[in-house]
Design a protein with these regions (language model features):
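Membrane-proximal intracellular helices of multi-pass ion channels
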Residues: 1-445
Length: 445
């Protein structure tokens, strides 16, 4: 036992994050297997519950059974708890229990919390965590209240539960819906494509949840004084706006030609916003043209922002790479933006993350295409959705076999936990010696 305790003390914060997510997924999968979790009162096979639990904890939204018709009220509640835990982060949830119970947060716990929410420093981490928890529940409550009139009109008292479920699912960028019935499965929000209230509330929840907790802190502290925002917050806000606006304009010009002007604008913006790893859709994605699907695939890979409820490669990663490219084109010695410069380590980390995500995306897509004999473009859309934790699909998820589902499970997990987190968890820090290898030159490009 003493040896076990010593080993636990040596566990790094990155290992705690990686194992924490895995543990919650496994626990959720076991609970969902129970007969009480399914509407038919039967034991659900482990492969289906593992996929569902992974998708919920990793806030993805890909499913192999319809959430609304297959799972009971208890099962849906379990899924919602998994979504909330995954959205906030396992470490944040555990820390919240410690704070509620009055236990002192140790320095090791504070360091782990810092890594979990991508905070710049350990100081003030407990205050920031309290702020995140309070802000999360307040925003989710407001979102649910705003949707009450629509869902209660359509579903009666059941509309209250639907409002709460979809508010949490949207804020956590999870994309799970409970609108399906035995006669119509996997509808997502297609029935509300022309409803301005549902569209706007869901889009706002997705964006607020996906821009990151530190960006919230900047907004609440500095209000509209953007000059005082952190550099990271400025980059996140600009990049998010660009990644929403450009695809929306493209979708408006290339798709939804038969819609009225208002409906077309709503559909274009919603399909763009949901690419920030949300997983809801109001339109038939399979009916969109191939160019739009290609853009959606790329956008899903990018995902949301660091320290947020979203997964994926992250908006800051792509922003750093693009800014570095412009600096290289301009023959600038360093990458600068908003009067600040990046450390070269940031550029190196961004390139590493991008390569890792593209590798997982391509190898996963090719593997599934070979196993299932499905068009590679559809499989790449699916793997981008999984590793970017976006949750959108062209309708092939339920048709895939066990091995392909396991590939998607791994991709969802890697996409939510984060590439560098797993690398740092698997590889210990190397002690640098004083001597360095001789410097040499190599030509690229």
């Amino acid at each position: 036992m003493p040896e076990l305790i010593r080993k636990k003390k040596k566990m790094s914060s990155f290992e705690m994050i990686a194992f924490g997510f895995a543990g919650v997924i496994l626990l959720g999968a076991i609970i969902l297997m129970l007969p009480i979790s399914s509407s038919a009162g039967v034991v659900t096979p482990f492969d289906k519950t593992l996929f569902t639990a992974t998708s919920a904890v990793c806030v993805t939204g890909l499913v192999v059974v319809d959430t609304g018709s297959y799972w009971s009220a208890f099962g849906q509640a379990v899924i919602l708890l998994l979504i909330q835990t995954g959205g906030l982060g396992v470490i944040t949830v555990v820390a919240s229990f410690s704070m509620v119970s009055g236990r002192k947060i140790s320095l090791m716990q504070r360091s782990t919390m810092q890594d979990a929410i991508s905070a710049p420093k350990v100081g003030g981490i407990v205050r920031l965590t309290k702020f995140i928890l309070q802000g999360t529940f307040l925003i989710e409550l407001i979102g649910a209240i705003l949707m009450f009139p629509v869902y209660c009109r359509d579903y009666g008292w059941k509309g209250i539960w639907m409002s709460v479920f979809h508010s949490v699912s949207a804020f956590c960028n999870a994309g799970f819906d409970i609108l399906g019935t035995a006669g119509q499965t996997f509808p997502s929000l297609t029935g509300y494509i022309a409803n301005p209230l549902i569209n706007l509330v869901i889009m706002l929840l997705i964006v607020i949840g996906g821009i990151g907790f530190l960006t919230w802190d900047d907004f609440c502290t500095n209000k509209w004084n953007l000059k005082r925002y952190r550099l990271q917050s400025k980059i996140i806000l600009v990049t998010t706006a660009v990644l929403i606006l450009l695809p929306a304009i493209f979708f408006f010009l290339s798709d939804f030609a038969g819609f009225s002007m208002g409906k077309r604008i709503l559909a274009s913006f919603f399909q763009s916003v949901t690419l920030r790893t949300a997983g809801f859709n109001t339109a038939d994605l399979g009916a969109m043209n191939d160019s739009s699907k290609a853009i959606m695939t790329l956008m899903m890979l990018i995902g949301g922002s660091p320290g947020s409820t979203a997964g994926g490669m992250k908006t800051t990663t792509i922003a750093v790479l693009i800014l570095n490219a412009f600096a290289t084109f301009g023959r600038e010695p360093e990458t600068e933006v908003f009067g600040r410069r990046f450390d070269n380590t940031v550029v190196k980390n961004a390139a590493t993350i991008a390569i890792l995500y593209f590798f997982l995306f391509f190898t996963g897509g090719i593997a599934i295409s070979q196993i299932e004999h499905v068009a590679l473009s559809d499989c790449l859309f699916e793997t981008a959705s999984a590793v970017g934790t976006a949750g959108l699909t062209l309708g092939i998820t339920t048709e895939l076999g066990l091995v392909s589902h396991l590939i998607l499970v791994v991709l969802m997990y890697l996409g939510r936990v984060g590439g560098l987190t797993l690398i740092y968890a698997a590889i210990s820090v190397k002690i640098q010696s004083g001597a360095k290898r001789p410097l040499d030159k190599i030509t690229v490009g």
